[in-house]
Amino acid sequence: LDRVKQYLQEAGVAYCEMGGVQPNPIDGKVYEGIQLCRREQVDMMLPVGGGSVIDTAKAIAAGALYDGDFWDFFIGRAKVEKALKVAVVLTIPAAGSEGSGNTVITKTETLQKLGLCAPEHLRPVFSIMNPELTYTLPAYQTACGIADMMAHIMERYFTNTPDVEISDRLCEGTLTAIIKEAYRVKQQPDNYAA
């Protein structure tokens, strides 16, 4: 985070911060972020972190330019017609949200965990995915990322879709590479090639 702030300052880019996003992001942080964006006249979101941080930023991006309750988008009461631009600095492996127009948020009052798909407005305009930003992650988080990558690949692999031989071979090759590199990254977390 300090590195990103330094780059923004050097480039003369004004910014404001909001922290405290938790895994399985909740609506309270989205409401807080919407208020912050409106008060500070934010024109772009730059979440620095993993999937929960990115999902929260996407929900804020949609809600900041909407006159109603952002939750309207999640329950189908409204459609996202405009949103703040979202760019991403990914600091955890295998989030997935850095390349999609989807977001998942939990409403604490009802414990509803719902997704929103609005790729034309919420897909990040760019994502910085530098492996060096994962070097300081705890080994557990790296292992979770590896398991998550494998799970997503296996979702595609164990399908009943016919005639996907090439896709199956790509999945097998990718899984083989992930398994091989997982051992290296465990021993050398700062190995860029792993």
What residue spans do the PLM features occupy?
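Carboxylate- and glycine-rich phosphate/diphosphate-binding segment that chelates Mg2+/Mn2+
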Residues: 102-194
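A short, flexible low-complexity segment enriched in Lys/Arg and Gly/Pro that occurs
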Residues: 23-30, 69-77, 176-194
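Residues at the C-termini of beta-strands that transition into short coil/loop
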Residues: 21, 90, 132
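Glycine/threonine-rich beta-strand-loop-alpha-helix active-site module
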Residues: 28-129
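ATP/NTP phosphate-donor binding region
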Residues: 1-44
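Hydrophobic packing residues within well-ordered alpha-helices of enzyme cores
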Residues: 4, 57-60, 178
